[in-house]
Every structure is written in structure tokens, then in C-alpha cells.
């Protein structure tokens, strides 16, 4: 990737700013035009622009914003538009910086589902995020940065059940804390759960063993 020119990288890598207002072009008068702006710069045909923009605004559920002025949106609305303006470019790699910082819980869930959809389409997504329970549910791998260096790089289940994360001020998922506490009490867990469904499975497995698992005296 380092050998690629900036022009090529700009087509292969999409970046969503933490502050969505910084991503607004400032020259378009409707959300629809704002989302289409990048495609226009690449010389994409008019028919393809309409097709791709229509698909993306449906995906992000922002049809009702299509005719609004980009500078008159709320923070959450602007965040969705910023995400749409990048996804419409169909980059191979998405870098998304705190995409839910201005969203309510419902909006947060919607955005993570969109990110999951991109992942299922084969898009590499690098997500900068502090909502640990969302990371547990949607991420494949976790990289912990400390003072500009990589402090930990591991699959999500391994990373989010590692107590060393707390040394860096990272709170483990509640489900992981439960699993670690049970294991410390001597319960034989086949894995440390990091999500609610996993925790339910672990507790159900213990119940099948009589409620005590293989706890040691």
C-alpha cells in the first residue's frame, strides 16, 4: 500500500472523520448532491451515480434527508451523510473514526449494522471505537494502541477476555468480567464469553452440569 500513489489510495481507501462536519464539501446544497460529489469527481456516468447514490441512501436510511441542505443537519444526521459519502465510493478499505459519537443508541445500532453489512460484502473495515460491547459484537480483531505503539493485537475473543487490557484503562465487556469471575471461582468454562449470547450459552452449559460446573473445592 505504501507504494501506491495518493490518487490510487483515494479510490481504494475511504476515511470517515470523527467530526462529520469536517467532511462536508461545503459546496453542495442538498444531501443527495453531497453524497454524489465524490463520484462526480471520478467522472462516473450520470446513470451510475444515480444508481449508487439511491442504493446508499436507502442502506443508511436517509431518504428523508435527500433534499435537505447538508449544513442544516443535526450531528447524527451529518454523521450518516458522511458515512454515505464514503460508502458510495465503494472503497476496498474503510477507515471509520468514532462513527457513533453523535448518535443515540438506536442510531448507533443502525450504523454498526451497516458496518457489518460492509464486512459481509468483503470490505476491510478499520474502526476506531471505544464502545467495547459493540466491538465485542462486531469486530474480528482488536488492536490496542498506547502512546502511538501497538500494545496488543489479537482476535476479538482473545483480546477482550485479556485482563491486561485493564492495565491500559480499557474496561472489559461485562460478560467477559462475569466469565473471568466464574473461572476464578473454579468453574470450568470452555471459553470466556464476551457477548450476551455467549454468556447465555456458558451459563446454560453450567446449569446442565448441575449449576456448579466442575468447580473445584
Where are these regions (language model features)?
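Catalytic Walker B motif of ABC-type/P-loop ATPase nucleotide-binding domains
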Residues: 94-97
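ABC ATPase nucleotide-binding domains
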Residues: 161, 165-217
Amino acid at each position: 500500500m505504501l507504494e501506491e500513489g495518493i490518487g490510487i489510495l483515494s479510490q481504494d481507501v475511504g476515511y470517515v472523520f470523527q467530526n462529520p462536519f469536517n467532511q462536508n464539501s461545503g459546496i453542495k446544497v442538498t444531501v443527495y448532491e453531497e453524497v454524489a460529489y465524490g463520484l462526480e469527481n471520478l467522472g462516473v456516468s450520470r446513470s451510475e451515480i444515480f444508481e449508487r447514490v439511491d442504493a446508499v441512501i436507502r442502506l443508511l436510511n436517509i431518504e428523508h434527508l435527500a433534499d435537505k441542505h447538508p449544513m442544516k443537519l443535526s450531528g447524527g444526521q451529518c454523521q450518516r451523510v458522511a458515512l454515505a459519502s464514503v460508502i458510495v465510493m465503494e472503497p476496498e478499505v474503510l477507515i471509520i473514526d468514532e462513527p457513533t459519537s453523535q448518535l443515540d443508541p438506536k442510531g448507533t445500532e443502525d450504523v454498526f449494522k451497516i458496518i457489518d453489512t460492509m464486512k459481509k460484502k468483503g470490505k476491510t473495515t478499520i474502526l476506531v471505537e471505544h464502545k467495547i460491547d459493540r466491538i465485542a459484537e462486531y469486530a474480528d480483531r482488536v488492536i490496542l494502541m498506547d502512546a502511538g505503539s501497538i500494545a496488543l493485537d489479537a482476535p476479538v475473543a482473545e483480546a477482550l477476555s485479556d485482563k491486561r487490557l485493564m492495565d491500559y484503562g480499557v474496561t472489559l465487556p461485562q460478560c467477559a468480567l462475569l466469565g473471568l469471575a466464574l473461572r476464578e471461582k473454579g468453574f470450568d468454562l470452555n471459553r470466556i464469553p464476551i457477548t450476551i449470547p455467549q454468556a447465555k450459552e456458558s451459563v446454560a452449559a453450567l446449569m446442565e452440569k448441575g449449576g456448579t460446573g466442575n468447580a473445584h473445592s
